[in-house]
């Protein structure tokens, strides 16, 4: 009888340990109140799967700034795919996506939106923020090589999504019949091959009523393809209040075809299913170490 009770207790304890949500202790914003002059961590909110090829982060810094997200900033310029190990080494293969409403603005300064940390949620594999100036809620949850964005728009006849391929050599192409944008960025900070490119594929679940591209700060409505130092693409549509638009994004250092292959990682899962799978993946890694004693702040420091 004692053996049966002991076995039952061990199984129950095991189930409790397995079910524990270790991600509740992780704060991706920890260490982001840093600058060139003073570091409190020199980190950024790296939203990713464990050991993912790509990280995604809200971008408050200017294009090329190693401090791509700082806690004291109050405007977001975009949501960036990043591979940056530290602000001193900087980034490579980066590009961004940003929802805009009302007047069409694609310049990173003019499209930027005020935000508050009160309207921001950051976990290891999920990020959400309210962009006040555009009245858009942006959410993202990644896999190893892909990411699913969920934009909740207001009622507006002029809702847009800007894809910024950044400077130092880039290319974009809008494919309306497939609700798709493809492109590549060559931006880097050294340490890459001469023919380096990060190819990306973006698929939307809403047809475009507006199509345009920009090159070196010049907007060209109706032009579906650009290759220049700094390029980007813009698609638009009218939206109802609370209408959700999804963007499925994947990239590859090999080719457009490989980027499309990587996009299959998202499968047919819903946004919630992908977010849960990301949370489960992090719990599997974080749960390998269980600490005893200490207070909540110490737990947060350890697991972050």
What residues fall within each predicted segment?
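Accessory carbohydrate-recognition regions in carbohydrate-active enzymes
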Residues: 20-304
């Amino acid at each position: 009888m004692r053996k049966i009770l002991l076995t039952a207790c061990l199984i129950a304890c095991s189930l409790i340990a397995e079910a524990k949500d270790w991600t509740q202790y992780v704060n991706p914003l920890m260490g982001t109140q840093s600058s060139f002059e003073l570091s409190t961590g020199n980190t950024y909110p790296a939203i990713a799967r464990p050991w993912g090829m790509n990280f995604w982060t809200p971008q408050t810094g200017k294009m090329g700034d190693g401090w791509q997200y700082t806690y004291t900033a109050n405007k977001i310029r975009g949501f960036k795919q990043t591979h940056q190990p530290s602000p001193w080494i900087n980034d490579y293969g980066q590009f961004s996506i940003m929802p805009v409403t009302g007047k069409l603005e694609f310049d990173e300064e003019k499209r930027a939106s005020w935000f508050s940390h009160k309207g921001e949620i950051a976990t290891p594999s999920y990020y959400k923020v309210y962009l006040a100036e555009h009245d858009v809620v942006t959410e993202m949850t990644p896999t190893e090589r892909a990411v699913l964005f969920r934009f909740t728009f207001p009622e507006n006849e002029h809702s847009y999504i800007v894809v910024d391929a950044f400077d130092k050599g880039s290319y974009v192409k809008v494919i309306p019949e497939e609700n798709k944008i493809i492109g590549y960025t060559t931006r880097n900070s050294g340490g890459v091959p001469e023919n380096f490119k990060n190819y990306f594929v973006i698929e939307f679940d809403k047809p475009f009523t507006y199509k345009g591209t920009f090159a070196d700060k010049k907007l060209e409505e109706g032009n579906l393809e650009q290759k220049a130092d700094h390029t980007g693409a813009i698609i638009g549509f009218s939206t109802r209040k609370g209408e959700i638009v999804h963007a499925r994004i994947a990239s590859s250092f090999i080719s457009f075809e490989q980027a499309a292959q990587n996009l299959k990682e998202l499968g047919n899962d819903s946004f919630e299913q992908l977010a849960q799978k990301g949370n489960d993946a992090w719990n599997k890694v974080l749960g390998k170490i269980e600490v005893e004693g200490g207070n909540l702040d110490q737990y947060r420091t350890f697991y972050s």
